[in-house]
């Protein structure tokens, strides 16, 4: 992560000699004010300005094509608009997928059952507010606690935000690397063995690696087991989301079209099945004939549709969304 930032700013003296577009000065200042952007040095601001202009051009051209019916989603200059794809991946998307042989597929599907046409677990009060992971690759932790929060609500009737920081700090021996990445099933195994996880209120998120501070006095949830779904089976993922609750998944989030997504059903042919970002499927549905997965992200409410993204469903496991699904049980 540090190497990437260094590369960007070693080049800053050369970048400052490139010309910004002065006609965008007002819009640049407005964008900075909107998202509270402040830069320590002029060279840093010069770098960010040129990245921002490049992203702005990308957004404008994409949205022009969207207006012509060429895309099912549009883009916007959100709080990530001054970052490159490489930075977003390095700072905010660090999913570490375990070796394939370690997976234990235990889900028993019932292909003959009738499932609802749409599901949104927010409507049942099973989804906490969207969180912001900041410059820490803790996507996996937020995905894991999001799934467990829903199970806690279904079992007890109480919706409680659980501590992603607890997972960041305490699950290293399970293969997780804190802000440098991890995986949801390893997080569940830690909670199982630890006999619990603290609440967010008692163990708040700091977006950095710390010494483990778990305290059983503040335990807010437990986990008895977790279930993994078969690779690439969107039909089984639909069944699990409908019957069990929100499901943890990994996706390919490495494209500007993803981190600058604003609304609609996301479908980018460049998206691969090499997953690098942990998110939470909280439902599914159909928008103007486009089937989608309703996905909760951890990039704050300024991302997408108030922190959510609708991703193409039944499009050949688009972005790898059905590659590594799992959910916990209490």
Curated annotation (Swiss-Prot):
Gene Ontology molecular function, alphabetical: cysteine-type endopeptidase activity
Signal peptide coordinates: 1-17
Cellular component aspect of the GO annotation: extracellular space; lysosome; phagocytic vesicle
Protein name, UniProt field: Cathepsin S
Function as written in the Swiss-Prot or TrEMBL entry: Thiol protease. Key protease responsible for the removal of the invariant chain from MHC class II molecules and MHC class II antigen presentation. The bond-specificity of this proteinase is in part similar to the specificities of cathepsin L.
UniProt family annotation: Belongs to the peptidase C1 family.
Glycosylated residues, chain numbering: 104
Disulfide bonds: 126-223, 136-179, 170-212, 271-319
Residue numbers annotated as active site: 139, 277, 297
Predominant subcellular localization, coarse grouping: other
Catalytic activity: Similar to cathepsin L, but with much less activity on Z-Phe-Arg-|-NHMec, and more activity on the Z-Val-Val-Arg-|-Xaa compound
Domain of life of the source: Eukaryota
Assigned EC number: 3.4.22.27
Record localization: Lysosome; Secreted; Cytoplasmic vesicle, Phagosome
Organism expressing this protein natively: Saimiri boliviensis boliviensis
One Pfam match: Inhibitor_I29
Keywords (A to Z) from UniProt: Cytoplasmic vesicle, Disulfide bond, Glycoprotein, Hydrolase, Lysosome, Protease, Secreted, Signal, Thiol protease, Zymogen
Propeptide: 18-114
Protease found in the keyword field: yes
Biological process annotations from GO: antigen processing and presentation of exogenous peptide antigen via MHC class II; proteolysis
